[in-house]
Amino acid sequence: MFHATTIVAVRKGGKVAVAGDGQVTFGQNTIIKKGARKIRRLYKDSVLAGFAGSVADAITLFEKFEGKLEEYHGNLQRAAVELAKDWRTDRILRRLEALLIVADKENLLIISGSGEVIEPDDGVAAIGSGGPYALAAARALVRHTSMEAEDIAREALAVAAEICVYTNDNIIVERL
């Protein structure tokens, strides 16, 4: 299975940024790609979405989520809840192994296959193998610096890449 990545999202000062590394790992010991894009712009470029987990599963979920965004006219929270319900109850979808971070100008959410839609209290979220490291770094930077959301996301991911062997420093950041 292809897995292992880090995605971090930061909301600060009316802006949101989502950063992802570029590494794709096969099994436990083989890097097969260094420059993968794990963040997408959805629904008329008004929503950012990043994934951690199986690439094929994530692409399926991106497509489903974009359909929900269209169905609910860009309402991120409603689309996220409906995706989580489908993901949890559908016999095929519930086998998908991935996590999503989605954000628009007002909301930042983590969506999981077990039906959770989580909005972080502090405007910072991270998923994937390096997620705990990126989350800690981003929280510290939000609390103790005047850095912008994009710079915090980039630096938090750089810290995770220094620690997590499944995360590289080929960082892509998208912002709204």
From Swiss-Prot:
Allosterically activated by HslU binding. It is found in: Cytoplasm. Its EC number is 3.4.25.2. Na(+) binds at residues 161, 164, 167. It comes from the Bacteria. Transmembrane segments: none annotated. GO terms for molecular function: metal ion binding; threonine-type endopeptidase activity. One of its GO terms (cellular component) is HslUV protease complex. PANTHER family: ATP-DEPENDENT PROTEASE SUBUNIT HSLV, METALLOPROTEASE TLDD. Protease subunit of a proteasome-like degradation complex believed to be a general protein degrading machinery. This is ATP-dependent protease subunit HslV. It comes from Pelotomaculum thermopropionicum (strain DSM 13744 / JCM 10971 / SI).
